[in-house]
Amino acid sequence: MRSLLLAVCLVLALHCGEAAVSCNTVIADLYPCLSYVTQGGPVPTLCCNGLTTLKSQAQTSVDRQGVCRCIKSAIGGLTLSPRTIQNALELPSKCGVDLPYKFSPSTDCDSIQ
């Protein structure tokens, strides 16, 4: 599953670069979170560092919407279990990072300010 997710992310990185924060950056920042999202357990420190970095880089509405679209595109083609979605939704709070969007396939990226 990791190989598939990585392949999807790399392909999407080529198509999501309109905001100042590129999909390559989003993928690099969130990649350390993959083990927690797919398997649970403790959240890796590098994952929380990536979320913090991502939040600090996405300063404008356009940036935040772009980050949201990259995340949605990366997870959109995957079959996600309810537990995987729950783990993704819990990430920001477990890391103490307040994000203006949720890691969910149902997030409306256009509504993010």
Curated annotation (Swiss-Prot):
The keyword Kinase does not apply. Keywords: Disulfide bond, Lipid-binding, Signal, Transport. Disulfide bonds join 23-70, 33-47, 48-95, 68-109. One of its GO terms (molecular function) is lipid binding. Gene3D superfamilies: Plant lipid-transfer and hydrophobic proteins. Residues 1-19 form the signal peptide. It comes from the Eukaryota. Transmembrane segments: none annotated. InterPro entries: Bifun_inhib/LTP/seed_sf, Bifunc_inhib/LTP/seed_store, Plant_nsLTP. One of its GO terms (biological process) is lipid transport. PROSITE patterns: PLANT_LTP. SMART domains: AAI. Plant non-specific lipid-transfer proteins transfer phospholipids as well as galactolipids across membranes. May play a role in wax or cutin deposition in the cell walls of expanding epidermal cells and certain secretory tissues. Belongs to the plant LTP family. This is Non-specific lipid-transfer protein 6. It comes from Arabidopsis thaliana (Mouse-ear cress). The lineage of its organism: Eukaryota, Viridiplantae, Streptophyta, Embryophyta, Tracheophyta. The gene is LTP6.
